A protein has these predicted regions:
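Long, glycine/tryptophan/cysteine-rich extracytoplasmic
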Residues: 29-86, 133-170
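Alpha-helical transmembrane segments and their helix-start/interface "positive-inside/aromatic belt" motifs
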Residues: 6-22, 110-123
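Hydrophobic alpha-helical transmembrane segments
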Residues: 18-23, 85-107
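Cytosolic-side transmembrane helix boundary signature
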Residues: 1-13, 95-112
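Hydrophobic membrane-targeting alpha-helices
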Residues: 28-31, 103-106, 129
Length: 170
C-alpha cells in the first residue's frame, strides 16, 4: 500500500477536518473532566469540573469546590485553586488554535498540512494526558503529615478514566 501525501484533500477529508475544527472549538468552552462525589454525609453529591473557560470550578454555584477543599484538608491534600494550573488558562487558547488550524487546512485543502496538524493534535493530546495524570498524582499522593485523618497506604488520586471509591465517597 502506497500513501500519497501530496496534492489536495478529498471532499470527505475536508468535511472531517471541518467537523474536527468545530468540535475542537466547542471543547475549548466545556469542561474536559468531571469528578462526582457522593457519600452518606453528602447525599446530594458534589461535583468538580475541570477544563473549559473556568479552569476548575465546583457545582452548586462554586460551593462544591469549597466543600471539597475543606474535605481535602482532613486527609492532607492540598487545596485546589483555579489559578494553580497554568494549563487551564492555556487550554482554551491551544484548542482554539487547533480549531482554526483544522478549518484553515480544510479550506486550503493541503494534505501535508492536514497530516501535520492531526499528528500535532495527537501529540498535544498525549502530552495533556501525561500532564493531567501528573497533577492528579501529585494531589493524591503528596499528603500533609499533619493531616487530621491518616489512612496508612491510602492515596487519594482520582482516576482519569472510570471510578474509584475513596473512603466513604463513591
Amino acid at each position: 500500500m502506497k500513501f500519497n501525501f501530496t496534492g489536495k484533500l478529498s471532499k470527505s477529508s475536508m468535511i472531517l477536518l471541518i467537523v474536527a475544527g468545530i468540535f475542537t472549538a466547542i471543547s475549548a468552552f466545556t469542561s474536559v473532566w468531571r469528578i462526582d462525589l457522593t457519600a452518606p454525609q453528602y447525599p446530594e453529591g458534589m461535583v468538580l469540573y475541570i477544563g473549559g473557560l473556568d479552569g476548575v470550578s465546583g457545582g452548586d454555584e462554586g460551593n462544591d469546590l469549597y466543600k471539597i477543599n475543606e474535605l481535602n484538608h482532613y486527609v492532607g491534600m492540598a487545596q485546589i485553586h483555579p489559578g494553580d494550573f497554568w494549563e487551564f488558562t492555556a487550554l482554551p487558547i491551544i484548542l482554539g488554535a487547533f480549531a482554526v488550524l483544522f478549518l484553515v487546512t480544510a479550506f486550503i485543502k493541503n494534505k501535508k498540512l492536514s497530516i501535520a496538524s492531526l499528528i500535532s493534535f495527537g501529540i498535544f493530546g498525549v502530552l495533556g494526558f501525561i500532564d493531567f495524570y501528573h497533577w492528579t498524582y501529585v494531589y493524591g499522593h503528596n499528603l500533609s503529615p499533619d493531616a487530621p485523618i491518616k489512612v496508612p497506604g491510602m492515596s487519594y488520586q482520582p482516576p482519569i478514566l472510570g471510578e474509584k471509591q475513596l473512603l466513604s465517597f463513591d
